[in-house]
Design a protein with these regions (language model features):
Chain A
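Membrane-interface helix caps of multi-pass small-molecule transporters
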Residues: 73, 97, 125-138, 156-160, ...
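Membrane-interfacial amphipathic/re-entrant helices at transmembrane-helix boundaries
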Residues: 2-68, 102-115
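Transmembrane helix-bundle core of multi-pass membrane transporters
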Residues: 142-207, 234-236, 256-265, 309
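Helix-loop-helix "hairpin" substructures at the membrane interface of multi-pass membrane proteins
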Residues: 112-120, 124-131, 185-260
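Single transmembrane alpha-helix segments in multi-pass membrane proteins
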Residues: 39-105, 133-140, 280-290, 324, ...
Chain B
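Bacterial N-terminal signal peptides that target proteins for export
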Residues: 1-8
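Bacterial N-terminal signal peptides
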Residues: 8-18
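A residue-level marker of the well-folded mature domains of exported/periplasmic proteins
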Residues: 22-318
Length: 337, 318
């Protein structure tokens, strides 16, 4: 026979039916969403594609993006952290106060700034350690622990600032500002740090034993325990990792405006969580992708940017547009579940 | 018999002490304000505490209780406690929001407490005895008039940053637009929300700079937002922007005006110290028995290099 026997239509084809095509498309959902948004944005305002605008957008995405990379680990392991915005504000305020007080003995030099950065990372790590320990050993829901610290951190910052602003010493600010405003090979430093964090996060999640443990715990904690995985240790480590990410994001944030106020980092936790979820990580844990999170973070910032670059939608409806895009992207991903 | 005697004696003592206290009436004044959650409210808390110290020193029979609330619900509970537990004779309140607090304030007033409302009016003016407020219309108008005068006959392109969608913000922006409309050469390119927040203002200004190749002046409409706007301009290294006007009188910005900063030539007041004025007027009227004016408007004035000194409070957090 010149023609081969047709395969049984009921058995083989389902693997290439629209459903599985949708599934594959679904994985690319956030990326397609971002591309669609970019096309619309360019049609509305050609300035969208200028190098300076793209660099603005990516720099803005760096703050919540770096936090979101850490958040991806926490969410994949089945946890959540609502406190990251407040923590960023507290770290920003504390590191400014520390650097200002160090100026007397160390001057406004690199040493002072490095110690400030170290303090930021340390505070972040300690906060993460506290979250992780209370959640695992104290057996309190992560939602509750971090809801509590969300209030605590911001209140402490507001207290330190007396409700006003904590401002960085001007001399230190001048020395420190290149960390935000500077460029390396023509690329703003926050973008480079964001890229490095994302790359490292991806490697840890997909190429190390630790990353596999995180995914195993998120998909079934009981089974992970039977498999002799140190569930408590791995979980605590995810919160510490996130705390360090928050510290890192704050290190980039402080030189931007040189001040911390009670409205610093407001709602960053929701942006970070939204970026993770848009990126295709399941809120109930078990599986996720770092690159998706990165795209999610950029997507969120782009929506705001596009709305600022155009005038077609009433300013009262900005939040509605953001909400709509989030739901649409999630809709295109639903094939995976 | 013994019991009745004791009872008579006790009531005589009580009556005596009551008449004694009537000769020097002790006044308890409750002050209910939003907690310090951004620069301006931090200034309110600061000035309220300053005024408490000064007034209690001046009038030894006056006791002032200050309560701060993070939202309307908490504030409603607090004024209820002030009336029932602390037995206040007068209440000075800066409501978090107008509508939800109108009923609770009316309830307190119905108990015989004298009520002074500050800044944000209630939806029913019958719930208050006196009203002390900043002038939001003037806040926008004074800034707009400065733009008209400064940009002159040649006019120019102006961008505006709005606060948070509220009645206050609408009044300010409408007054600003009306004032600059007097010069047809001034073009308001766009007005977007910066939420009275440094970070948001930074982003909005960055996007304005991307979108508009030539901007002559910026009305940031608030000093916190002006901080972000200045940084965005600095980062973009744009030289076309001649000046930025914030508002409300943050100490750092008043300092810039004092020092003759080119980018920050003026400021418009919307003083958080209005809470102190309201407290002083209320206490004075309670102590002297003279009625208080039903409405007191604290004017918004233009701060220039010449008069900046009198608006500079270096110790205030705002």
């Amino acid at each position: 026979m010149s023609t081969p026997n047709p395969p049984l239509p009921e058995v083989a084809p389902p693997r290439v039916t629209p459903r599985s095509v949708l599934t594959r498309l679904g994985t690319l959902g956030p990326l397609l969403g971002l591309l669609a948004l970019a096309v619309v944005a360019t049609l509305l305002n050609p300035d969208f594609l200028t190098a300076s605008n793209i660099s603005n957008v990516l720099t803005r995405a760096a703050f919540t993006g770096i936090i979101a990379v850490g958040m991806t680990f926490v969410i994949i392991s089945g946890g959540i952290d609502l406190s990251v915005g407040s923590l960023a504000a507290l770290i920003a305020g504390s590191m400014i106060l520390i650097m200002n007080s160090l100026k007397g003995s160390l001057g406004a030099g690199v040493g002072t700034i490095l110690l400030g950065m170290l303090a930021a990372l340390a505070i972040g790590a300690l906060a993460g350690l506290f979250h992780g320990t209370t959640i695992t050993r104290g057996r309190i829901e992560p939602f509750i622990v971090t809801l509590g610290t969300l209030g605590i951190y911001r209140a402490v910052l507001t207290y330190l600032a007396q409700g006003g602003a904590i401002s960085l010493d001007l001399d230190i600010g001048d020395r420190y500002s290149p960390v935000y405003y500077g460029r390396l090979l023509g690329i703003p430093i926050p973008i480079l740090v964001f890229a490095a964090v994302a790359l490292l996060g991806g490697l840890i999640l997909n190429r190390t034993r630790y990353g596999r443990y995180v995914q195993a715990i998120g998909s079934n904690e009981q089974v992970a325990r039977y498999a002799a995985i140190n569930v408590t240790g791995v979980k605590i480590a995810t919160y510490v990792l996130l705390g360090v990410c928050v510290g890192l994001a704050t290190i980039l944030y402080v030189p931007q405006l040189g001040s911390a106020t009670p409205s610093t980092g407001l709602l960053w936790e929701l942006d970070a969580i939204a970026a993770v979820i848009i990126g295709g990580t399941a809120l109930r844990g078990g599986s996720g992708r770092i690159w998706g999170t990165v795209v999610g973070a950029v997507l969120l910032v782009t929506i705001g940017n596009v709305l600022n670059l155009t005038n077609i939608i009433s300013v009262y409806l900005n939040a509605a547009v953001t909400g709509l895009v989030i739901i649409l992207v999630a809709f295109f991903q639903r094939g995976r579940r | 018999m013994q019991a009745i005697k004791r009872f008579v004696l006790l009531s005589a003592v009580l009556a005596g002490s009551a008449s004694l206290s009537q000769s020097t009436p002790r006044q308890v004044i409750g002050v209910s304000i939003p907690s310090a959650d951004h620069g301006w409210t931090a200034g309110v808390v600061y000035h309220a505490n300053q005024a408490k110290a000064a007034l209690e020193k001046k009038y030894p029979n006056v006791q002032i209780i200050i309560k701060t609330a993070k939202d309307s619900t908490e504030q409603a509970n607090q004024i209820q406690d002030l009336a029932t537990v602390n037995k206040i004779g007068a209440l000075v309140i800066l409501p978090q929001e107008s509508a939800p607090l109108t009923r609770p304030v009316a309830n307190v007033k119905a108990k015989g407490v004298f009520v002074t409302v500050v800044d944000r009016g209630l939806t029913d003016p019958k719930a208050q005895d006196a009203y002390v407020a900043g002038d939001n219309t003037a806040f926008g108008r004074v800034a707009g008039e400065y733009f008209v005068q400064r940009l002159g006959a040649s006019g120019g392109n102006v961008v505006v940053l709005r606060g948070i969608p509220t009645v206050i913000d609408n009044q300010r922006v409408a007054a600003f637009n009306a004032a600059v409309a007097k010069n047809p050469k001034i073009k308001v390119l766009d007005a977007k929300y910066g939420n009275w927040n440094r970070d948001d203002a930074f982003k909005v200004m960055q996007d304005y700079l991307t979108r508009f190749p030539k901007i002559d002046a910026v009305w940031a409409s608030d000093d916190d937002m002006a901080v972000g706007v200045l940084r965005a301009i600095q980062q973009a290294r744009r030289k076309d922007i001649k000046f930025v006007v914030g508002g409300a009188g943050m100490k750092e910005m008043i300092k810039k005006v004092m020092d003759g900063d080119q980018m920050m030539p003026v400021n418009v007041t919307y003083p958080p110290s209005m809470i102190a004025d309201a407290m002083r007027l209320t206490v004075e009227s309670r102590v002297t028995g003279k009625p208080m004016k039903a409405t007191t408007i604290i004017p918004s004035v233009l701060v220039t290099k010449a008069n900046a000194k009198q608006f500079y409070f270096p110790d205030s957090p705002f």
